[in-house]
Amino acid sequence: KIDMLCLDMWFGPKIWPRIRETILHLRKLQPDVMLRARGIGNYGDYYTPEGFVPGRRQNTDTPWFVIYPLGTSFSYDPVAANHKGAAWIVRNLVDSVAKGGNFMVGIGPDGDGRFHPTAIAQLKEAGEWLKVNGAGIYSTRAREGDLWSEGADLRFSRTKDGKAVFAFALKWPGERLVLRTVRPARDSVIRMLGTSEPLKWTLTGDGVEVRIPPGMQDESRRPCRFAWGFQIRPEGA
């Protein structure tokens, strides 16, 4: 079974009738296959911004994900230093999810079918981050309107049923995290993803203030690197 079929270009008006015929035939063979919209417009199911993350939450019901090479291009890059790093992957993934999309990292093999060791290492690092923070990424949704972010270093997602909001700090918040657009339920337990210890929090004039334990100021005692997720049950959930 084919989950997704990626078309990569517009072939022009002379070829279009054959392309359309092929698309319709594919739909008959497998109605639930998802087709990339590039070159086929409304016949497609999802679209793919390439080489950039949209600047704001996308006002669309059409699925989308960013495609971005880890090196200098989607083909094999032999230079280790050209690979952008696990921190770059995580930051852009969180940013894309907060805006209602997803993030695909592109890497290419060499002539023998092998991937660069640096690319493999960086993907594994990002995978370790996802093991800790996946609850705030997988099957989540963007928050409404402009609530996807607070400033440059805070991003949000929510569960489909709205019973949990996830705040991601793209920079370590220090001893306190202030969230201005989330109001927790009175009995909400706020915790950092990857830990079981409830965090103390209070409502202030600025919003909700979450206190980070002194022990976590030591990098080695944090559950992950790059970005830190906090799970909150919002008021009314």
Label the predicted regions.
Residues 1-237:
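Mature catalytic domains of secreted/periplasmic carbohydrate-active enzymes
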